[in-house]
Amino acid sequence: MTKSAELRQKDVAGLEAEIKSLQKAHFGLRMQKATQQLGNTATLKATRRDIARAKTILAEKQAAK
């Protein structure tokens, strides 16, 4: 789980890279769930919320410009 304070320290390019990596991780987890290989399904929810948190902070930084 990514903390908001850690995300706020990153610049716009860093946030975009973080979002991209989180989306790849989320896709992998969805594929594991579809093939019934995922043991802890709560990680899907946590990853989805991390993506939303990063996108929110990215939008705040872009609006501040």
Swiss-Prot record:
Transmembrane segments: none annotated. Keywords: Ribonucleoprotein, Ribosomal protein. Pfam families: Ribosomal_L29 (PF00831). Disulfide bonds: none annotated. GO terms for molecular function: structural constituent of ribosome. GO terms for biological process: translation. GO terms for cellular component: ribonucleoprotein complex; ribosome. Belongs to the universal ribosomal protein uL29 family. This is Large ribosomal subunit protein uL29. The gene is rpmC.
